[in-house]
């Protein structure tokens, strides 16, 4: 009889407690459709540990996914987790309007299939899906016990649109003032793709001169672009030229294309443009950037007048936001910081698509809401968007589980503790969690140079 009544308490007791009730269905992959038009996929492990991981995928194809990648899926199943995730229902690839509801609907469908109530459910979000999961942490609906965000877009769409506008405006206005490349209010995906291609061409050509490189570095500072994009170690702190080359590579290898084509999809979802730069003080933005020294050095070497460029940018900035689009994204695609369940966030220290500075802005929101005790953030010493090892992700999930077991964070999210847990999985990798304090989100709402209220 003990097995039949083992509920949430089972996971809190000693290891010899009754094992979790097993599902009504055999191990394997399952799929289904939701009323919203979304579909879902799930995996049941050989021996279920009682926990469901509700996975929220990133920006891109609206296809159901239930894990970050195949090796991580296999390890999670090996550890006994049941996995489920939805495709989201679109039509925009920026699916925040429907994603939270689609995720809960997928969870409900999976629970019906299992025929057993999970002892615990953890929302695990990646990139844009990290914003989905962070919103679930504020709206757990009695279903979600904890949240793990990975490379999460946790500063939300309003900030993303604003600081990316600062960056592309700087590139277009200083490098190609006569070209009139459209930066907001795209009429079609094709128009956005052409604008992205035009910006890539301008940046590629400008990289050939010291003046061009200095201005690309300035735009990169506004984009919160890391100075480390590829390789196992970053350029030396004073090697400003090498840092700039890494920023350039990130921009032309896909960064600019993602920023511009992604904006078109967000505009489609929001019904307009949420970004503004009219009234933004570009000198204050640069002064707040961790890369200000690099930019100033490259301007000096090029013999360029940085003050003049900053004055030009501030004077000519004239993009105003559409109030309806701002209201729409405020509702669907921003966080309040009002966490209702524990959350662990992990991020690489150098992320060219969702800068690690998102975590600084997010932590301030959570602190302002009085919920800092529920949030922990941990950082991986590597470059690239979502470039985590499977062991690093599983160790983070296990740390969150221990937080839910004990009710306390203690040192669970400390780098040394996470590294030891990851390496104990013996997956043939060495974990890279490191002490790190992210810089401010340059151009973020309420940061220097841009008002909190638009």
Where are these regions (language model features)?
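C-terminal His-loop and adjacent cap/lid subdomain of alpha/beta-hydrolase
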Residues: 18-123, 128-454
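Secretory targeting and sorting signals
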Residues: 1-17
């Amino acid at each position: 009889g003990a097995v039949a009544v083992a509920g949430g308490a089972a996971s809190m007791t000693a290891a010899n407690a009754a094992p979790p009730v097993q599902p009504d269905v055999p191990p394997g992959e399952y799929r289904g459709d939701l009323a919203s038009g979304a579909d879902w996929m799930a995996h049941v492990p050989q021996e279920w540990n009682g926990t469901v991981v509700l996975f929220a995928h990133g920006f891109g194809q609206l296809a159901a996914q239930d894990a970050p990648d195949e090796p991580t899926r296999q390890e999670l199943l090996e550890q006994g987790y049941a996995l489920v995730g939805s495709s989201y229902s679109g039509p925009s690839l920026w699916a925040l309007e429907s994603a939270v509801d689609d995720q809960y609907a997928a969870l409900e469908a999976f629970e019906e299939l299992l025929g057993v109530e999970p002892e615990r459910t953890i929302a695990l979000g990646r990139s844009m899906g990290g914003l989905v999961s962070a919103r679930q942490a504020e709206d757990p609906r009695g279903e979600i016990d904890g949240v793990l965000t990975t490379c999460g877009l946790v500063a939300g769409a309003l900030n993303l649109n604003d600081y990316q506008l600062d960056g592309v405006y700087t590139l277009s206005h200083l490098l190609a003032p006569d070209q009139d490349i459209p930066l907001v209010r795209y009429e079609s995906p094709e128009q956005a793709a052409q604008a992205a291609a035009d910006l890539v061409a301008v940046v590629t050509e400008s990289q050939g001169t010291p003046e061009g490189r200095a201005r690309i570095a300035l735009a990169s500072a506004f984009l919160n672009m890391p100075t480390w994009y590829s390789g196992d170690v970053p350029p030396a702190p004073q090697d400003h030229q090498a840092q700039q080359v890494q920023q350039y590579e990130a921009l032309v290898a896909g960064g600019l294309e993602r920023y511009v084509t992604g904006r078109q999809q967000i505009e489609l979802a929001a019904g307009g443009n949420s970004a503004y730069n009219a009234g933004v003080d570009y000198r204050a933005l640069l002064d707040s950037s961790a890369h200000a020294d690099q930019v100033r050095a490259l301007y000096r070497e090029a013999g360029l007048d940085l003050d003049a460029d900053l004055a030009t940018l501030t004077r000519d900035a004239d993009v105003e936001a559409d109030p309806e689009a701002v209201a729409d994204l405020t509702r669907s695609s921003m966080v309040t910081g009002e966490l209702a369940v524990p959350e662990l966030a992990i991020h690489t220290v150098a992320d060219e698509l969702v800068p690690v500075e998102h975590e600084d802005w997010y932590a301030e929101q959570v602190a302002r809401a009085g919920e800092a005790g529920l949030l922990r953030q941990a950082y991986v010493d590597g470059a690239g968007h979502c470039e985590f090892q499977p062991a690093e992700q599983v160790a983070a999930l296990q740390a969150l589980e221990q937080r839910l077991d004990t009710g306390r964070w203690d040192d669970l999210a400390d780098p040394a503790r996470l590294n030891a847990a990851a390496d104990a999985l013996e997956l043939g990798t060495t974990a890279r969690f490191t002490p790190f304090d992210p810089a401010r989100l340059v151009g973020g709402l309420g940061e220097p140079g841009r008002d909190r209220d638009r």
